[in-house]
Amino acid sequence: NPVDGVEITYKLASGGSATLAITHPNGDVIREISVPGGSGVHRVNWDLRHSTGSGSETWAAWDNPELARPIGNRGAWVTPGVYTATVSANGSSNSTHFTVRGDPEMPQITQDMYDARERFMLEAQALTAEIQAYMRENGMGGGGGRGFGRGGGPPIDTPQGKLTAAMRAVGGAYSSLNGGQVRGGTLYPPTTTHRQQFHLAKSLFDEVRGGMDR
C-alpha cells in the first residue's frame, strides 16, 4: 500500500528521543509526534491530519495487509497550503517544507471551502473537548471518544442528559464529515444541517452551564 500522507526521511548521528512537529500555514504547530530516535536513517509519515486532541502521540509503521490505513479515531484533514515538518533530536532541529494540495479529482472544492471545513472541524473538536471536561469536573463521566455513540442514555431533561445529547449532536456532525472505521468522510464544507447540529450542541451546553452556575 502507498504511504498514508507525506513521507519524511531523517538521519540521526546518535541515539536519543526525537520529535516530529508539523506547522500549519498559519504558524500554529498542529501535531507533535514522538518518532524513532536511534542512530541512522529513519522514514516516517504524517497523515495530513490534525491531532485528535487525545494526548501524546507516538509514530508507528502501519503494515496491516488487509487495511490500507488505520481505521481508529483520527483527526480532521488539514486544508491545502504549505506546511513545515521539523524533526528535533539531540538538541538540534531540521525542517523541510512541503505543499498539501486539494483533491485533483474534486476541482469544484475551492480553497475557501477547504478552509471552512477545517475551521468547522476544529471548532467541533474543541466544543466536544470542552463538554467532556465539564462533565468530568461535575461527576457526569465524559471520558472516552467524542460522543459518537448511539443508544440509550440519561433523561434529556437532566443536565447529564442534555450534555449527552450535545455530545451526540456535535459528534454526529464531526463524524459524518471525517468518516470513521471503514466509512469514508467528505472534503466538502459543512452543510446547514451540520451547522445546526453544532449550534444545538452549543445551546444545550450553554443551557446546562447557565443553570448549574447559578
Residue ranges and their predicted role:
Residues 52-56, 88-96:
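Short acidic/polar inter-strand loop motif in beta-rich domains
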Residues 97, 102-145:
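Charged, amphipathic alpha-helical linkers/stalks
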Residues 1-19, 23, 43-45, 110-129:
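Contiguous beta-strand segments within globular domains
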Residues 29-76:
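Glycine-centered tight-turn motifs at strand-turn-strand junctions
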Residues 1, 13, 37-39, 76-80:
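Surface-exposed coil/turn segments at beta-strand junctions on protein surfaces, enriched
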Residues 98, 129-214:
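Mature extracytoplasmic or organellar-lumen-exposed domains after removal of signal/transit peptides
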